[in-house]
Amino acid sequence: TAGLIGDTGTTSYGSSKAALIFATKTMATELGVMNIRVNALAPSLTKTDMFDQMEEKARNKILQSTALKRPAEVVEVANAALFLASDLSSFITGQVIRVDGGLTT
């Protein structure tokens, strides 16, 4: 979600994520004529090894800003990817699906 919201000290990281969002939207318009869909996921904190290595204060700050007050499970992010890869999303392209528990709400 760093490409969708700003935060102190995240200029480089957020800019790189925003560039991926732009690339997703641009590629969707370029490849749509070939029936190729391009979408992206924007997950927030996800329970991974990286999550476990975060400073507790930083982790809690983000979790308190999240509507669901918890990190995503890896399977929850994977399920969003499976949806986008399936025929259930056949008319979705150029979108950024926020799997963020309400962080960017």
Label the model's feature ranges.
Residues 29-33, 90:
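Alpha-helical segment proximal to the catalytic Tyr-Lys
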Residues 52-66:
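A short C-terminal helix-loop "cap" of Rossmann-like NAD(P)-dependent dehydrogenase/epimerase domains
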Residues 13, 21, 91:
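Catalytic tyrosine of NAD(P)H-dependent dehydrogenase/reductases that use a Tyr as the general acid/base
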Residues 1-5, 103:
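Active-site segment of SDR-like NAD(P)-dependent oxidoreductases
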Residues 16, 24:
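Active-site helix of classical SDR
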Residues 4-10, 32:
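Active-site "substrate specificity/gating" loop of NAD(P)-dependent dehydrogenases
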Residues 21, 38, 42-53:
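Short, flexible catalytic-loop segment of classical short-chain dehydrogenase/reductase
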Residues 40, 63-88, 92, 101:
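C-terminal helical subdomain
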